[in-house]
């Protein structure tokens, strides 16, 4: 969301939640390794901008 602070300046705020699931596999030497990976990061950003 962009919020006007004055005629030329604004603040932008963004919040996102992601849900990711994946399977990983590989070898650790001769031994096979497998993993199930679940990520759910909350990503936030705040920006200050100037319009001209």
UniProtKB/Swiss-Prot annotation:
GO biological process: catabolic process
Keyword tRNA-binding: no
Pathway: Aromatic compound metabolism; naphthalene degradation
Entry keyword set: Aromatic hydrocarbons catabolism, Plasmid
Superkingdom of the source species: Bacteria
InterPro entries: OMPW
KW Protease (keyword) present: no
Entry's Gene Ontology cellular component terms: outer membrane
Biological role stated in the UniProt entry: May be involved in the conversion of 2-hydroxy-4-(2'-oxo-3,5-cyclohexadienyl)-buta-2,4-dienoate to cis-O-hydroxybenzylidenepyruvate. DoxH and DoxJ encode different enzymes that may have interchangeable functions.
Name the record gives this protein: Dibenzothiophene metabolism operon protein NahQ/DoxH
Organism in which the protein naturally occurs: Pseudomonas putida (Arthrobacter siderocapsulatus)
Name of the encoding gene: nahQ
């Amino acid at each position: 969301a962009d919020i006007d602070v004055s005629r030329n300046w604004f603040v932008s705020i963004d919040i996102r939640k992601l849900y990711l699931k994946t399977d990983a596999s590989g070898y650790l030497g001769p031994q096979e390794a497998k993993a199930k990976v679940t990520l759910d990061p909350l990503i936030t950003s705040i920006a200050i901008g100037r319009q001209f």
